[in-house]
């Protein structure tokens, strides 16, 4: 039966499982390119306030038609309360999130910005636990795994921030120098990935991850009362643009900052808006719907590896011992958290099956575990389907 279903979902003879893996690998390359392109944009002098404004305008233009036509029936009437919630989501999920990311990226490097993002699932879990949105069962392996994973992520972020360490790889001496000589017209405008203030950059990236995690946590109750994901994202983008414009009005006084001075600058903004916010959004929502949230999250470290290769070639990025150690700890922590979430779903599925069985036979049975947990936190766009995991 499963094989027949898989065959029906095949495209040009390619089974859906393989489609999902190809899509996720492609998605990581798209996101990895965004890290490198964003750093290149900063190297070229694009304003940290102008860049996100243009990026979110493009994203909003891409999202609006889909939100309007696909969610006509399920979109509730807009109220002042909803507008306030969307404004708050934009403040943490767009303005703080993207602002801290660009500040952190400007002071560190694409690879370690990507490495820090691997800690978001653990920070989200910790934040939800502290707010009592999610319960922690320390007497079960899923609870222990999530606590251990969170501790590893915190340790990794601390190592990256507090210990830079010696340089263990410098591509500029061979590969990057050769490429820069033979392709100077292409690579020269990109600049390099030399960090300015490593510790400050890492603090900014921690702020980025905290903002991202807070956005995930607080978006869950909003989606319960306003179950139109595309519309919520569109409103969030809109208010994010307004907030960045207000900040730019006070902090960005140079009118030339809003003008594109080269084709490279235009390319970086189009890439960020179309690929990172448009195409990637569509691919991710399909992969989550068909493969489940854990399947999608497992591929995140692949992005870090791809970023390292891209940044080394295009920007001549150097790698530091502290960054490598921290990245390994964070990725290990990510997988512990994902394992804990997977085990949690198994417990929930067993409990649900037991309840259904009891109802069918008219017999009252004890739950599978009196400590069974009901997950109450939902990552945006993360459907619970795990058909292909």
Curated annotation (Swiss-Prot):
Cellular compartment(s): Vacuole membrane
Organism annotation: Arabidopsis thaliana
Residues that bear Phosphoserine: 372
Record keywords, A-Z: Amino-acid biosynthesis, Aromatic amino acid biosynthesis, Auxin biosynthesis, Auxin signaling pathway, Cell wall biogenesis/degradation, Membrane, Phosphoprotein, Plant defense, Repeat, Transmembrane, Transmembrane helix, Tryptophan biosynthesis, Vacuole
Biological process terms in GO annotation: auxin biosynthetic process; auxin export across the plasma membrane; auxin-activated signaling pathway; cell wall organization; defense response; L-tryptophan biosynthetic process; plant-type secondary cell wall biogenesis; positive regulation of auxin metabolic process
Protein name according to UniProt: Protein WALLS ARE THIN 1
Cellular-component GO terms for this entry: plant-type vacuole; plant-type vacuole membrane; plasma membrane
GO MF entries: transmembrane transporter activity
Chief site of localization: membrane
Expression tissues: Mostly expressed in stems and hypocotyls, also present in seedlings, root, leaves, flowers and siliques. Ubiquitous, mostly expressed in vascular tissues and secondary wall-forming cells, including developing xylem vessels and fibers.
Ranges where the EamA domain occurs: 32-161, 210-339
Lineage: Eukaryota, Viridiplantae, Streptophyta, Embryophyta, Tracheophyta
């Amino acid at each position: 039966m499963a094989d027949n279903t898989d065959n029906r979902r095949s495209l040009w003879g390619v089974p859906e499982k393989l489609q999902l893996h190809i899509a996720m690998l492609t998605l990581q390359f798209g996101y990895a390119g965004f890290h490198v392109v964003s750093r290149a944009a900063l190297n070229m002098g694009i304003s940290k306030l102008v860049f996100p404004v243009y990026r979110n305008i493009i994203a909003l233009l891409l999202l609006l038609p889909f939100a309007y036509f696909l969610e006509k029936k399920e979109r509730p009437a807009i109220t002042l309360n909803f507008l306030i919630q969307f404004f708050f989501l934009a403040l943490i999920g767009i303005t703080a999130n993207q602002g801290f990311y660009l500040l952190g990226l400007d002071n560190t490097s694409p690879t370690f910005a990507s490495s820090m993002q691997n800690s978001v699932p653990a920070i989200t879990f910790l934040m939800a636990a502290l707010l009592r949105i999610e319960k922690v069962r320390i007497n079960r392996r899923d609870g222990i795994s999530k606590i251990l994973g969170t501790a590893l992520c915190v340790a990794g972020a601390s190592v990256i921030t507090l210990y830079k360490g010696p340089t263990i790889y410098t591509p500029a001496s061979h590969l990057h120098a050769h490429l820069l000589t033979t392709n100077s017209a292409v690579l020269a405008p990109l600049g390099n990935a030399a960090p300015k203030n490593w510790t400050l950059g890492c603090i900014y990236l921690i702020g980025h991850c905290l903002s991202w995690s807070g956005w995930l946590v607080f978006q869950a109750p909003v989606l319960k009362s306003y179950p139109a994901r595309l519309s919520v994202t569109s409103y969030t983008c809109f208010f994010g643009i307004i907030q960045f414009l207000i900040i730019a009005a006070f902090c960005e006084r140079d009118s030339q900052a809003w003008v594109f001075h080269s084709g490279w600058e235009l390319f970086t903004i189009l890439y960020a808006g179309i690929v990172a916010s448009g195409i990637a959004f569509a691919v991710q929502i399909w992969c989550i719907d068909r493969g489940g949230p854990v399947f999608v999250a497992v591929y995140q470290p692949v992005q870090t590896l791809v970023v390292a290769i891209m940044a080394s070639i295009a920007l001549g990025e150097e790698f530091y011992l502290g960054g490598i150690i921290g990245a390994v700890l964070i990725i290990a922590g990510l997988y512990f958290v994902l394992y804990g979430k997977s085990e949690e779903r198994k417990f929930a599925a067993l409990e649900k099956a037991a309840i259904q069985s009891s109802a069918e036979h008219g017999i009252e049975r004890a739950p599978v575990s009196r400590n069974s947990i009901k997950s109450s936190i939902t990552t945006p766009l993360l459907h619970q389907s795990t058909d292909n995991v």
